[in-house]
Amino acid sequence: MKKFLFSLCLLSSTVLASPQSELTERLNQNAGFEAGFTQKVLSPEGDVLMQGEGDVKILRPNLFRWHTQTPDENLLVTDGNTLWYYNPFVEQVTLMGLEKATTQTPFVLLTRNKASDWDNYSVSQNGDAFTVSPKADSAVKSEFIVRIQENGKVTGFSVVEQDGQRSDFDFTKFEAKKPAKNNFTFAIPDGVDIDDQR
């Protein structure tokens, strides 16, 4: 009888774990990772609008480097305070404060996982896929679906815009390791236009 009650208690605690707490626990499994990615942008009707690829490095909290190589090269990197967006084709770099730049995107949940970040979202779970939806009064309007295994391996994510357009990102060559901190700085190249929005 005691074994039965103990098993029932364990089962109850598992059932009572919310999707948000499960996602938080999985995100906390690793302090950083590196991966390649492929990207596909789909219209609301499911037509492929664009495909791309690149690589990403994340070191929690707040450090990330997102390098898109195709179809058009660009780089998004932050040192935890300043966010640089560099577009070599137009020879311009935009500087923003990290807090301001990430307030309205659920991507911030991958990079820092602070308790207060969850205030604007509700979370549902379907296996290893967690749908992070903005609450009605939130300034965030896009839905974020993160695919993460129990061991903390992030296999990809999707962003669904209000109009139904969808961007799918699938991670390849995932390595659960802390990238070196020197990946999260940016030296502005000579001769580029600087748009400082900090």
Swiss-Prot record:
SUPFAM superfamilies listed in its UniProt record: Prokaryotic lipoproteins and lipoprotein localization factors (SSF89392)
Any one of the GO CC terms: outer membrane-bounded periplasmic space
Alphabetical list of CDD domains matching this protein: LolA (cd16325)
Superkingdom classification of source: Bacteria
Signal peptide interval: 1-17
4Fe-4S found in the keyword field: no
Cellular compartment(s): Periplasm
This protein's UniProt keywords: Chaperone, Periplasm, Protein transport, Signal, Transport
A GO BP entry: lipoprotein localization to outer membrane
Reported function: Participates in the translocation of lipoproteins from the inner membrane to the outer membrane. Only forms a complex with a lipoprotein if the residue after the N-terminal Cys is not an aspartate (The Asp acts as a targeting signal to indicate that the lipoprotein should stay in the inner membrane).
Family as reported in the entry's similarity comment: Belongs to the LolA family.
Subunit structure: Monomer.
Record's protein name: Outer-membrane lipoprotein carrier protein
Organism listed in the record: Aliivibrio fischeri (strain MJ11) (Vibrio fischeri)
Lineage of origin: Bacteria, Pseudomonadati, Pseudomonadota, Gammaproteobacteria, Vibrionales
Gene name in the database record: lolA
